[in-house]
Amino acid sequence: MIKAAIVGGSGYIGGELIRLLSMHPEVEITTITSRKFAGKKVHKVHPNLRGLNLRFTDKYEFDADVIFLAVPHGTSMRIIGEFLGSAKIIDLSADFRVSKDLYEKYYGSHEKPELIDKFVYGLPELHRKEIKRAELVANPGCNATAVILALYPFRDVTSEAIVDLKVSSSAGGRRENVASIHPERSHVVRVYKPFHHRHEAEVLQETGVKAMFTVHSVDIVRGLLATTYFKFEGSEKDLLKRLLMYRGEPFIRLVTDKGGLQRYPDPKYVIGSNFVDIGFSYDSENSRAIVFSALDNLIKGGAGQAVQNMNIMFGFDETLGLNYYPLYPG
C-alpha cells in the first residue's frame, strides 16, 4: 500500500484522480490540496464523490510516496521545489513535457529549465522502461497522446501530418469562461486553434513528425477525436501491419470493422475509460492515409494515464485500478 497526495484537486482532472485513486486497491489518499476550497469536503466540489470522507487542505505538509501535481500550466515549475526528494512526482501540467528549446518556442520562458531533463515523458506505450525507473514523470497532454499514438508507427515514413481535432468542453478546464457557458457552447463546431497548438511540440519531440493541428470545440462534455492525415506509400495491409505494433498494449484497441456505425473510432465508446481506440482508412490512388484516434481527455488524456504511470513506477500491474470498460451509452 502506498500513500498518495494530490496537489490541485478541485479541477476536472483532479476530481478524476480522486475518484480513481480512492478505488485503487494499493493506494491511500492522504492529502488533497486546494486553496479555494480548503476545509471543505471533497463532494462539495465533486458531487459524484459524495460519501468519500476526505477534505481539501491548503497545507503542503503531508506524508506521501507519490505526489500528483494537477495544477495549471506554469504553476508546477513554481512549486515543485517544495516536493523534490520527498516522493515520486507525476506532473499533469505541461511544464516538464518537452525540451527547453521547444518549451520556449511554444510556451515562453521556463523558471526551472534545469529540471526538464530529469523528467521522463509519461507515455507508457513508448517509455515503459524509463517510467519504471523514474522519480519524476511528466504526464502527456490529451491531444498529444492521441496524435502521438496515431503517428508513432509511421515516424520513419512521414515527416509531416495534418491533424483535425474535435475536443470537448471539459478540455478547457473548470475555470469560468464565457466560451464554455451553455448558451455559447451548445451546438457549436467552433475552430479555436487553427495553427501552432502547444501540443504540437510533444508530437514533434516524440515522433519527429511536424504535425499541424487544427482544433475544433464540439458539443460534447468529454472525449476527443484526432483525425491525422499523411502521405503513405504502400497498401491498407501495410498500414495495419504498422499499427499492429500496439498488439498486446492493455489500453489500445485497434478498430478494424469493415462496416456499421462503429467501423471507425468514436469518443462516445471510450468515455470513462483509459482506452484509446485507433482506426484507419487508406486511399491507394493518392497514397493518402488517415489514422483516427479517440480517447477520454480526462482519463487516458489525464488522470487515468497518470495512474497508469504510477502503477508502472511502483511495480504494480499496469492496469490496476483502471481495468474497466467504457460507459455506454454516454
UniProtKB/Swiss-Prot annotation:
UniProt-annotated binding residues for NADP(+): 10-13, 34-36, 297
* SMART domains the record matches: Semialdhyde_dh
- Tell me a GO biological process for this protein: arginine biosynthetic process via ornithine
What is this enzyme's catalytic activity, as reactions?
Answer: [amino-group carrier protein]-C-terminal-N-(1-carboxy-5-oxopentan-1-yl)-L-glutamine + phosphate + NADP(+) = [amino-group carrier protein]-C-terminal-N-(1-carboxy-5-phosphooxy-5-oxopentan-1-yl)-L-glutamine + NADPH + H(+); [amino-group carrier protein]-C-terminal-gamma-(L-glutamyl-5-semialdehyde)-L-glutamate + phosphate + NADP(+) = [amino-group carrier protein]-C-terminal-gamma-(5-phospho-L-glutamyl)-L-glutamate + NADPH + H(+)
Question: Where, per UniProt, does this protein localize?
Answer: Cytoplasm
Gene Ontology CC: cytoplasm
Active site annotated at which positions? Answer: 142
Q: In which pathway does it act?
A: Amino-acid biosynthesis; L-lysine biosynthesis via AAA pathway; L-lysine from L-alpha-aminoadipate (Thermus route): step 3/5; Amino-acid biosynthesis; L-arginine biosynthesis
Q: Does the keyword Amino-acid biosynthesis apply?
A: yes
Pfam families, alphabetically? Semialdhyde_dh, Semialdhyde_dhC_1
UniProt EC number: 1.2.1.103, 1.2.1.106
The record's GO molecular-function terms, alphabetically, read:
N-acetyl-gamma-aminoadipyl-phosphate reductase activity; N-acetyl-gamma-glutamyl-phosphate reductase activity; NAD binding; NADP+ binding
Record key words, sorted? Amino-acid biosynthesis, Arginine biosynthesis, Cytoplasm, Lysine biosynthesis, NADP, Oxidoreductase
Protein's job: Involved in both the arginine and lysine biosynthetic pathways.
Matches recorded under HAMAP family: ArgC_type1, LysY
Spell out the family assignment given in the record's similarity comment.
Answer: Belongs to the NAGSA dehydrogenase family. Type 1 subfamily. LysY sub-subfamily.
Q: What is this protein called?
A: Putative [LysW]-L-2-aminoadipate/[LysW]-L-glutamate phosphate reductase
User: Which species is this record about?
Assistant: Pyrococcus abyssi (strain GE5 / Orsay)
Which gene specifies this protein's sequence?
lysY
